Amino acid sequence: MIPGELIPAEGTIELNAGRPTVTLTVANTGDRPIQVGSHYHFYEVNPALQFEREQARGMRLDIPAGTAIRFEPGDERVVQLVALGGTRQIYGFRGEVNGAL
């Protein structure tokens, strides 16, 4: 073994297996690009992103950790969100929840 080496288990690894998901159409109505990271509470993203916001409460992008999606001005795209795990308590971001979901 080499220090830092990762040896994954045999077979396919499925990200976020069994977690609830939702698919939303998101439009950037602003005049600047907006980038959203993999673990950002999607409900609290920039208000220039227009979508069914209540459906995104307690959800994040269903993409690999450490990655992001960029929404260019005027862009509209479909994204899949996945439920946040852990204790489901949200603090920070834009300060719209600051507590349990």
UniProtKB/Swiss-Prot annotation:
EC number in record: 3.5.1.5
Q: In which pathway does it act?
A: Nitrogen metabolism; urea degradation; CO(2) and NH(3) from urea (urease route): step 1/1
Q: Which GO terms describe its biological process?
A: urea catabolic process
Q: Known catalysed reaction(s)?
A: urea + 2 H2O + H(+) = hydrogencarbonate + 2 NH4(+)
Keywords from UniProt, A to Z, are: Cytoplasm, Hydrolase
Asked if the Swiss-Prot or TrEMBL record annotates the protein with the keyword Cytoplasm, the reply is: yes
- Taxonomically, the superkingdom here is Bacteria
Which EC class heads this enzyme's classification?
hydrolase
Summarize subunit and interaction data from the UniProt record for this chain: Heterotrimer of UreA (gamma), UreB (beta) and UreC (alpha) subunits. Three heterotrimers associate to form the active enzyme.
Family recorded in the similarity comment: Belongs to the urease beta subunit family.
Among NCBIfam families, the record links this protein to:
PRK13203.1 (NF009682), urease_beta (TIGR00192)
Record-given protein name: Urease subunit beta
Q: Give the organism the record lists.
A: Thermosynechococcus vestitus (strain NIES-2133 / IAM M-273 / BP-1)
| Chain's gene name | ureB
